[in-house]
């Protein structure tokens, strides 16, 4: 790979991936709402864009050929926002916006972060009451289904990466 985009680039998973990518000489455009408390090393292979993720992001990205777009940005992974359906729905829209950016820039592959928490969606019909945190898993599950369908319709190569519980230095979830 020569050029990639990583949303959530200053987050736990995004920054870890970026460090591995630059070790291999890959140029990375790291997108995050803030680089305060920067987790990324100084490298001429990294371009930082401090921005939210929506369709207007495409205007801020360098116009080059991209091999992959890794989407790790997701609001409300802990705290009260994890149970807020409005926040979780905005995350799904953000992921669809990323798919549209990929299509517009002819990015070869769109990779999106999922979670083992998606599996809660399969138990919902058997429960009388849920915990607020289940909304996060349900939203991730819905996001995957929407993206699988949408990316097929726009002919965008798509990979859903379902992670288990990930731990390490700097993880705040």
Question: What name fits each language-model region?
Answer:
Residues 4-24:
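N-terminal Rossmann NAD(P)H-binding glycine-rich loop of SDR-like oxidoreductase domains
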Residues 119-120, 134-135, 159-173:
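Flexible, glycine-rich beta-alpha linker
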